[in-house]
Amino acid sequence: MTLPKVTAVEQVSALVTVLGALEVEHDLEPGVLRFEIQVETPQSILAADGTALVARLIHASAGRCTALHYGTYDYSASCGIVGRYQSMEHPAADHAKAVMQVAAAGTGVELSDGSTNVLPVGDRDRVHAGWRLHARLVQRSLERGFSQGWDLHPGQLPTRFLATYAFYRDGLDVTVRRLAAYAGVGEPTEYLDEPATAAALADTVVRGLECGAIAESELGEIDRETLVRLRR
């Protein structure tokens, strides 16, 4: 489930209380009911006291929050951005998502980017323009550490898949060589990778495997067990 338009920690705390009561009422395992938070108000990013409220929202969820979603258009409108400039790549959007990213780091909470309302519909030129825009925005999100994003139209699914597959395949050979060298099963490379970078490289490969962009046969001396170990 998704909790939208959050403006106060108390709203998250209230949902936690309700879910706990539902688990007791229906004899469910404690903590099994979880939720995602839609970050679509300025108040969910910056509290009146100047603190990053989104970080407090995560901790107020008592481990029930699984993801943060950026809400492109509600957030932009609340910041006073006129319609023609409301976008996933507006500076206000990037600021909000950067705060979300730092707040979620190390918590296990996933991140999801927002959507574009420019749809691939109409004549051939408009469809192709919509696809080009969407593919570029998906690539941009992935480059910035947002592995998921919202789509508003079935016509955006082809570019979602294509951009995601291309992202995880791009540079795969170099990534595999670096991981093999770090794990001690391959030749040394020109990179001096530290544990945190190796974990990020392994995470990228695992995500590529899980979405179908990469086959295990392409990993050479690196196996899933090694990836899991390095990813931690």
Predicted regions and their residues:
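Expand to "…catalyze enediolate/carbanion chemistry for C-C bond making/breaking, isomerization
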Residues: T2-R232
